[in-house]
Amino acid sequence: MELEGLWWKGQLAVDIHQTLRYKELKLPSYKGQSPQLNLRRYFADLIAIVSNRFKLCPTARHLAVYLLDLFMDRYDISIQQLHIVALSCLLLASKFEDKEDRVPKLEQLNSLGCMTNMNLVLTKQNLLHMELLLLETFEWNLCLPTPAHFIEYYLSIAVHDTDLHDGWPMICLEKTKIYMAKYADYFLEVSLQDHMFLNYGPSLVAAACVAASRIILRLSPSWPTRLHRLTVYAWDILVPCIERLLIAHDNDVKEASKHKNHLSHTAAQCLFPPASPAPPQAHVQQHMPPYLQSQHHQLQFHHSAPQPQNCQPIITAAHASAFPLQTCASAIPTSIQARGHIQTTASVSLAAVPIEVKPCIGVSYNRSYQVNGHYSRLTQCFDR
């Protein structure tokens, strides 16, 4: 969608939205049966970090994760091979959604920390075979809508001057729109972390991201009539997805608070060292797997709740009690379990392969795939 410009502002916006909603109904089914499902979070983070490093558009990032989800759902794949699959999904998605000069080059991918640590080296031939295998799996159809394809259209009317902030007219409409866009982008990234969001339609997830952002910003009504008409989603339909997003937000705020307290405690220890050495404390970032923390300073990717400045005090750690979901059938659970973090090593034990899963590529990464003979010609995009 990057090449099509700001389609949501054009005359064909309604038609494009209807087309996306129609394609949404024909998306492949996702069963969540991958034997490597416990590694899914790590590879979704990997795609997000790499796409952020190369400044790829959100639609490319979301499409890459979606392609990875569908591919993992169908095959039993080794851990080393999953790195190749994830990067191939990102390359395909970037070629389909983004500009050509933003597509990562082969040598850039090989220089990534995750590749060097695993002693993996991508070649043009390996990458070509993997991309062809992915394209054949999806029957050469990459026009698969994701929440990122809908979000801008819904954000176009997400904030209006008739909205109220804490029951009062808004003082700075433009800044509120900026915060709305930042929070919607944050919730979109949250939806990438959990495969359970694949149980909802992409347009529903996008609408829920807008609704959750309005709740965080304390805008009322939480779901105005204009958004109901544009998205064709009633509030009651959005509530389950909204609750899941807000729970994730609460967990992020708690993790950020723990990290802040830990830093304060560390600073106090530097000023007033204790008599006996204190045991070291490890901090695990909410959206950064331990495997990637060593490359974090190189990739420069930060995934945390945005902190607004110089406007209304719109963020709070206890939003569930400060502004509950009005008309919500069930309140947000009071006991929130933090989401697990993936500990990825080369010796991870994998679950048994379900009957539906095809154990076709659980081999070493440099295996040549069986593709049709007429795919012998290298395309121009590999001459980088």
UniProtKB/Swiss-Prot annotation:
Instruction: Provide the disulphide bond pattern.
Output: none
Which keywords belong to this entry? Cyclin
| UniProt keyword Ribonucleoprotein present | no
Mention any Pfam family matching this sequence.
Cyclin_N
- Gene3D superfamilies xref list: Cyclin-like (1.10.472.10)
For molecular function, the Gene Ontology terms on record are: cyclin-dependent protein serine/threonine kinase regulator activity
* SMART domains found in the cross-reference section: CYCLIN, Cyclin_C
InterPro entries under this entry?
Cyclin (IPR039361), Cyclin-like_dom (IPR013763), Cyclin-like_sf (IPR036915), Cyclin_C-dom (IPR004367), Cyclin_N (IPR006671)
Say if the entry is tagged with keyword Ligase. no
Residue intervals of the Cyclin N-terminal domain: 15-143
Query: What GO terms fall under cellular component here?
Result: cyclin-dependent protein kinase holoenzyme complex; cytoplasm; microtubule organizing center; nucleus
Official protein name in the record:
Cyclin-J
Q: Provide the species name.
A: Xenopus laevis (African clawed frog)
Gene behind the chain: ccnj
